[in-house]
C-alpha cells in the first residue's frame, strides 16, 4: 500500500514554499485541508503558485475540488515544479500498489 498524506494549510514545498490557502470544509487536528487550486507562496521564484494534482489517488472532493496530497505539485515559476510535503502524519489515503 502507498500512503499519501493530506496537505494542510502551512505545509511546505520542496522549494521552501508554503501553502497559503485551504478549504474550511474540513480540517485535520484543527488545520484546514488544502485543495486543488489553493495558493502556494514560493520564495524560490518569488511568485504565488497553485496546487495541481499529480500521481495516483482515491477520488475525494471537498467544496467540489480534489484534496491535495503529498507529492502533488505547486505550479509557480519554478521548473521543474516543486512538490508538496505533508506537514501532518495523522490522515492519509491508502492506495493499493497495484493501482499505482
Language model: regions and residue ranges:
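Intrinsically disordered, low-complexity proline/glycine-rich segments
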Residues: 1-100
Amino acid at each position: 500500500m502507498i500512503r499519501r498524506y493530506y496537505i494542510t494549510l502551512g505545509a511546505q514545498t520542496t522549494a521552501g514554499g508554503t501553502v497559503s490557502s485551504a478549504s474550511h470544509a474540513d480540517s485535520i487536528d484543527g488545520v484546514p485541508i488544502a485543495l486543488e487550486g489553493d495558493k502556494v507562496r514560493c520564495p524560490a521564484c518569488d511568485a504565488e503558485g497553485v496546487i495541481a494534482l499529480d500521481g495516483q489517488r482515491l477520488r475525494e472532493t471537498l467544496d467540489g475540488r480534489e484534496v491535495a496530497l503529498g507529492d502533488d505539485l505547486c505550479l509557480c515559476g519554478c521548473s521543474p515544479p516543486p512538490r508538496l510535503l505533508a506537514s501532518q502524519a495523522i490522515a492519509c489515503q491508502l492506495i493499493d500498489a497495484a493501482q499505482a
